[in-house]
Amino acid sequence: MTLQQEIIQALGAKPHINPEEEIRRSVDFLKAYLKTYPFLKSLVLGISGGQDSTLAGKLSQMAITELREETGDNALQFIAVRLPYGVQADEQDCQDAIAFIQPDRVLTVNIKGAVLASEQALREAGIELSDFVRGNEKARERMKAQYSIAGMTHGVVVGTDHAAEAITGFFTKYGDGGTDINPLHRLNKRQGKQLLAALGCPEHLYKKVPTADLEDDRPSLPDEAALGVTYDNIDDYLEGKTLDSAIAKTIEGWYVKTEHKRRLPITVFDDFWKK
C-alpha cells in the first residue's frame, strides 16, 4: 500500500460522493449521538462565514430540527456562535451564513479582550507572543468560549474539520481542532461545496477564498498560500489521482509533520513520532 493509499484509508476519503446521501449521513450521525446521550440538549458551533462552518452549521440545525420534531423535546437547540476578534473583515458573509443556517439561537462573543488580556499576562511573565502564536491564541480562545457555552447548555461542540484540512493538519491544536464531534470528517473541500450547493447555499459562501485569518501581520492570508498547494491539489490527492511528484511530496510532508495533531494526547504506547 502506498502512502497515498494509507492516507486516503485513514481519513475515510472517497473519490466520488452522492451529496444527498452524505447530507443524510451527517445529519443522522449527529442525531444518533444526541439520542445516545439524552442529557445532551444542544449543538454549539462557531460560525465564521466560511464554507466549512456554514456547512457544519446547516447540518447541525437540520439535525436539531428533526430530532425536536421526532422527540417533542423543545429543549433541544442549535447555538451558532459569532466569535469576532474586534471587527471582522468579512462580517457580511457571517451574517449571510447565519441567514442561510437559520439557527435556533445566535450568540456573539468578541474574543479580542480575552486574547489581549492573555497576551498581557504572558508579557508580564516575560513571554512576548509572536504574531503566529497570537493567531493560535485566537483560535483557542474561540474554542474556550464554545466549550463554556456548551457547558452551560448541556451541549457538545461541533467541529468543521474535513479530510482536506486533516491531511495537512491545517488547524490549531486545542483550538479549532479541539472539538467533540466532526460531521464533515471524510469529505474533501470540493465535496463540501457539493453538499452546500445541494442545500441551496448562496454561492459566494462556498466560492470565497478560504482563509483562517488568524495573523495580524498577514490578514486574510489564503489557506493555499500558507500551505503551498491548492485545495484542488489536495482534493485530487484524496481522490486517488496522480499528481506532480513535487506537489504530492508537499502534501505528504504536511501529513507526516502534523501527525501529532491527529493523535491527542501522545502516550507511551505511541511510536509514530519515531519513524
From Swiss-Prot:
InterPro entries, sorted: NAD/GMP_synthase (IPR022310), NAD_synthase (IPR003694), NH(3)-dep_NAD(+)_synth (IPR022926), Rossmann-like_a/b/a_fold (IPR014729)
Gene3D superfamilies for this protein: HUPs
Residues given in the record as deamido-NAD(+) binding sites: R140, K173, D180, H260, K261
Keyword Metal-binding: yes
A GO CC annotation given for this chain: cytoplasm
Record GO terms (molecular function): ATP binding; glutaminase activity; metal ion binding; NAD+ synthase (glutamine-hydrolyzing) activity; NAD+ synthase activity
GO biological process: NAD biosynthetic process
Annotated disulfide bonds: none
This enzyme's EC code(s): 6.3.1.5
Binding, ATP: G46, I47, S48, G49, G50, Q51, D52, S53, T160, K189, T211
Catalytic activity annotation: deamido-NAD(+) + NH4(+) + ATP = AMP + diphosphate + NAD(+) + H(+)
PANTHER family tied to this protein: NH 3 /GLUTAMINE-DEPENDENT NAD + SYNTHETASE, NH(3)-DEPENDENT NAD(+) SYNTHETASE
Entry protein name: NH(3)-dependent NAD(+) synthetase
Organism annotation: Salmonella typhi
Gene from which the chain derives: nadE
